[in-house]
Amino acid sequence: MATPSDSSPTAPPGGGAVAPGQLIGERYRLEQCLSSDPQAPQGRLWRAADTLAGGAPAALRQLGPAVDPEAAGRRWAKLQGLLHPQVPRFGAAIAEGSDLWLVREWQDGRTYRELLEARAARQLVFGGGEVLLMLRQLLPVLVVLHGQDLVHGDLCPANLLRRERDGLPVLLD
């Protein structure tokens, strides 16, 4: 999610050598790299365990040295102020080595891309009613974002998660 006035170029991904088991910010133990494309411009996404919260899961985004840390920090601070039940809470921004790590609340569920692929494998699609319901559930989230002068910039099935506990769409990345 970015501000409309954010004109920084797409930054290369995080490049620091890290591996599962590594501790980030003396708190988050990396468990699994979830990025399907490690060269993605938004960096690498990791599932981690918060060692100060009994191993609770967290999502960490690893941004490399090509990212402007001041601009990313300003954007992250704005996101930390966002409070909506369909937007994961945004935690710390951790500078470690040449990388910037952005922490957010973990959400259990499947992305709409995964749901589409699973249905396509069975030669099924989402019905019109399902799509309309999802859009009605998502529009209030976008209203909150836009009210804070934030835009998502990449609203697609891969960035929408159907939350396991209540079935609501959750806006990611």
Give residue ranges: language-model regions.
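AlphaC helix of the protein kinase catalytic domain
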Residues: 112-125
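Conserved short submotifs of the Hanks-type protein kinase catalytic core
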Residues: 97-111
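Activation segment signature within eukaryotic-like protein kinase domains
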Residues: 134-135
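Conserved N-lobe loop of protein kinases adjacent to the ATP-binding glycine-rich P-loop
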Residues: 49-56
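Flexible N-lobe loop architecture of eukaryotic-like protein kinase catalytic domains
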Residues: 83-87
